[in-house]
Amino acid sequence: MAEAHQAVAFQFTVTPDGVDFRLSREALRHIYLSGINSWKKRLIRIKNGILRGVYPGSPTSWLVVVMATVGSNYCKVDISMGLVHCIQRCLPTRYGSYGTPQTETLLSMVIFSTGVWATGIFLFRQTLKLLLSYHGWMFEMHSKTSHATKIWAICVRLLSSRRPMLYSFQTSLPKLPVPSVPATIHRYLDSVRPLLDDEAYFRMESLAKEFQDKIAPRLQKYLVLKSWWATNYVSDWWEEYVYLRGRSPIMVNSNYYAMDFVLIKNTSQQAARLGNTVHAMIMYRRKLDREEIKPVMALGMVPMCSYQMERMFNTTRIPGKETDLLQHLSESRHVAVYHKGRFFKVWLYEGSCLLKPRDLEMQFQRILDDTSPPQPGEEKLAALTAGGRVEWAEARQKFFSSGKNKMSLDTIERAAFFVALDEDSHCYNPDDEASLSLYGKSLLHGNCYNRWFDKSFTLISCKNGQLGLNTEHSWADAPIIGHLWEFVLATDTFHLGYTETGHCVGEPNTKLPPPQRMQWDIPEQCQTAIENSYQVAKALADDVELYCFQFLPFGKGLIKKCRTSPDAFVQIALQLAHFRDKGKFCLTYEASMTRMFREGRTETVRSCTSESTAFVRAMMTGSHKKQDLQDLFRKASEKHQNMYRLAMTGAGIDRHLFCLYIVSKYLGVRSPFLDEVLSEPWSLSTSQIPQFQICMFDPKQYPNHLGAGGGFGPVADHGYGVSYMIAGENTMFFHVSSKLSSSETNALRFGNHIRQALLDIADLFKISKTDS
């Protein structure tokens, strides 16, 4: 394999004969091409910035306005009502005239036309922002759309009809509104009523009233002031205090995973699958840089914020003693690869051209064929990213701030993303229920040192060609990486393809230089720190119980026959399953998005409601008529859907209380109410996994082209983490996590309760898979 010095532009040594310079032509060539590529990207960004800045206008529309003004002037019609002549008189004459009077008139008309054009764009964007601030459509039934909503929809379509770029709507998105304190307090008390007895509820009610009357008004004023100044009053604090200031390991506690297609297999060649996948990812990055990706649109017309996509690639979480830092680079031309305890650098470009899939396959195969042993301390080095953040920050500062260690660490942290070549094989075998769970655990934490948990995402390649992702959470939420993953899997399957022998299409360029081994000089003291982090991470990973399963009896198609939303159906089933599992209700977290607002991220839906608990209790008694149970279920479903809509439209509970708590800390004001609210454990943390954000193939035509979604670790010591994907008309996937050290939880047991709860609710409506 090539040595590390190939990556250095020049070296020099002092000899008795003078100074000896050694130039690396390959490195200098890469530096030159990198500079050329950077300038190309800058020009593209400038062009995109102009096009984005004038949306929904365009250079063509500007030219039309100018031509209309000039044409009317030659027809002796003054559409400017004298403004052109006023502009002409105001033209500066300090440095002489602008030529003939006709030239001055033409210049004045161009200035007038540009002003009219810019004013029109401004009015269009403000009108669009006002229209996008309307959310009444979310609270109406599809069959009973009001006239106001119909008119609103027509106006939105007219104003956004021109083909938008990825960030075209960013400045037209409304700001996240700050809810009123009384409204938030009322919704909070309503959410905890089913969880507290009368005495505990009256106590909480008293604390809430004291907070609302005495402390909250002052905190709210500061928060409203921030909402006027900041783009989003929540997102920066959420990123900093929930993610970057966390000092516990991010492996399991924060990072989450995503699975490959599990019902089909494109190839068993590990290197070939990676070649196609990495090529597809860089294709996506190129589209991202050029803003060629269509923004995600609700109902095909309401744009979602695309801000989180900016840091998808070339991003690393840098550890700090008190808080971490997200480092994002505008460009990266390589990936970092881990295999059998060794780290490699793989270039993605040959000159200015992206390597073809077959070339990338060859490079990855060279790594797989390499038999060189790891250097001392290299094998478990990545365990530093899996342990405590303070320990990692101290080790990084002490052992990786200079020399070859710094150079190699920079190579990893400046990579487009991280690639892990695993030695184990994983796949989903319907006849072996444990296979999906083992696959999930491998993606969630691996062996604690074969993932670089600080990278924005790690692409994981199993020996048999199966893939997966491990994603760092602070830079974005699951729908963002899901958008990339959908593109990659569809591109790999339907656009790039494989030969009959399972290799990438085409012939490799054998003249490409081989991947470069990274060089390390890790002293024993650092190796001790690595081992300590590994032991912390291993204890954490060994304590995770993960149960993943496919639910086959029915899917979205059958649930719709219950006249309820699939998400509400599953959430109510989770409440029934949890009560059967523990004999009690608990504070339940469901992640909702606020991306209809600029730089919006998530909000919490408190799924355990008085209506859902009433339904569960009625189900448990076994003495209620089916019609009564159906009515209770529909009430619970309607309540859940309404709460979800409120959360999406900025009227949630928890982000507002969280920000009030942060303000109270800044002001040094203590609130017993906020202290208690923010310390409540989420014993059941849930999330629905998005799918089909991109339409690259027809899922009805290819029903087996389904991923199994993804999952995350348990949030509470004695709680469950549940992610689910309503994968199609006839199936669902669930990922249930808990801690083995807890005597209260068992992921397998809870998963079986979920299965039975889904079947029992479906039985209420007398529907089966044959009906869907």
From Swiss-Prot:
Stated EC number for the protein is 2.3.1.21
Q: Which UniProt keywords apply?
A: Acyltransferase, Fatty acid metabolism, Lipid metabolism, Membrane, Mitochondrion, Mitochondrion outer membrane, Transferase, Transmembrane, Transmembrane helix, Transport
| Residues reported in the UniProt entry to bind (R)-carnitine | Y589, T602
Expression by tissue, per the entry, reads: High expression in heart, skeletal muscle and brown adipose tissue. Also expressed in white adipose tissue, but not in liver.
What family name appears in the similarity comment? Belongs to the carnitine/choline acetyltransferase family.
- Residues annotated to bind CoA: G555, K556, G557, L558, I559, K560, K561, C562, R563, T564, S565, P566, D567
Which Pfam families does UniProt cross-reference here?
A: Carn_acyltransf (PF00755), CPT_N (PF16484)
UniProt-recorded name of the protein: Carnitine O-palmitoyltransferase 1, muscle isoform
GO term, biological process aspect, one: carnitine metabolic process
Report the locations given in the UniProt record.
Answer: Mitochondrion outer membrane
Instruction: Spell out the InterPro entries in the cross-references.
Output: Carn_acyl_trans (IPR000542), CAT-like_dom_sf (IPR023213), Cho/carn_acyl_trans (IPR039551), Cho/carn_acyl_trans_2 (IPR042231), CPT_N (IPR032476)
Q: Which PROSITE patterns does the entry link to?
A: ACYLTRANSF_C_1, ACYLTRANSF_C_2
Which Gene Ontology molecular function entries are recorded, alphabetically? carnitine O-palmitoyltransferase activity
Give yes or no: UniProt keyword Acyltransferase: yes
UniProt organism field: Rattus norvegicus (Rat)
Ranges per topology, Cytoplasmic: 1-47, 123-772
The entry's active site is: H473 (proton acceptor)
